């Protein structure tokens, strides 16, 4: 084999994952890191999660399109592990292009990506309405039912749109099944076949220029030395397998999902960046050991938790739902680090803790009288966790916009140092505000 046949300088690949229940601030960090990446890849989830970016004081919320779209010249990929609503996609494209951002020439969609259809949305919403107090807290956007169809081999893919006759036949069979569930079990209206067929086929010509073999394209990009950034959605504790089941999302949110959801070999993942807030939040139902505040629970309304919610502007970027807040749970973080193989951490929203008299860190639990130093598996055991806290002095100085570690208040440094000790991996980045430039860099993920 000639030396020229072997690429001695392959591109590096970094995976960004949330280590909590989502909403960790991944979008800002992905955007920040794209100055060293030629491509950004979404590999799971759908338009149920919003990534909020603030660049030059202007706020942008992305739901499907990777955060790299805000950087000129960066290619963006939607992998086969995503479930795609064409309606939501084109709405997002139109919003971005109306702001002068070039999208369609830089966006590439896997032909194997599963489609979200109107009956998925109808089932999602009808189920949630029927569940009453037992609801999971779904966004009602059809994500779960689309993944169900994928696993049941009923799913329709992007590539199926280009075979209209076969698409029509499979759609009819799917609607026979789903309309029976909607009308006979959920007591909801049926979804119209012809209207659905016409709508979905109308997207085919618009989608086709963006559809490609994403897996092959990523391989080729690496081979010529280009760096890729893999952008996770939601968070580890919402993972369908590793989260607080059944209060989870419908996809794998962990770093390993990048391999299956984008079609890249696991040995190609060079660095895993775990994103965690300096405190914790959760949206919807499910156990939350270090919880301080829940607007819907009169027994969980501590003043400091409300302060975190107000200062941190803790409302879902897509749903607008208020988030539950609590102290940073390092025992849960330890679980996420182990599952993801985290190389280093990025702590976000440190500035939200400014002005507190004291800051607490959950370092473990007691469960039925026994000590535990890591989050257990499944919702029922997690719901029995009583947090064990360490308390730190707060700081009155503002950390907003600080870009150097040694300029942080001493108590903030002490708190973060302890988080690093308990987590067992280095803190490589700290976010001190919502803007792209309000960031402390200790080690660059693409240069480690």
Swiss-Prot record:
Record flagged with keyword Transmembrane helix: no
Catalytic activity: IMP + L-aspartate + GTP = N(6)-(1,2-dicarboxyethyl)-AMP + GDP + phosphate + 2 H(+)
Binding site for IMP: 23-26, 48-51, 139, 153, 234, 249, 321
Subcellular localization(s) per the UniProt record: Cytoplasm
UniProt: substrate binding residues: 317-323
InterPro entries: Adenylosuccin_syn_GTP-bd, Adenylosuccin_syn_Lys_AS, Adenylosuccinate_synth_dom1, Adenylosuccinate_synth_dom2, Adenylosuccinate_synth_dom3, Adenylosuccinate_synthetase, P-loop_NTPase
Subunit-structure text: Homodimer.
Protein's name according to its UniProt entry: Adenylosuccinate synthetase
Organism for this UniProt entry: Paraburkholderia phymatum (strain DSM 17167 / CIP 108236 / LMG 21445 / STM815) (Burkholderia phymatum)
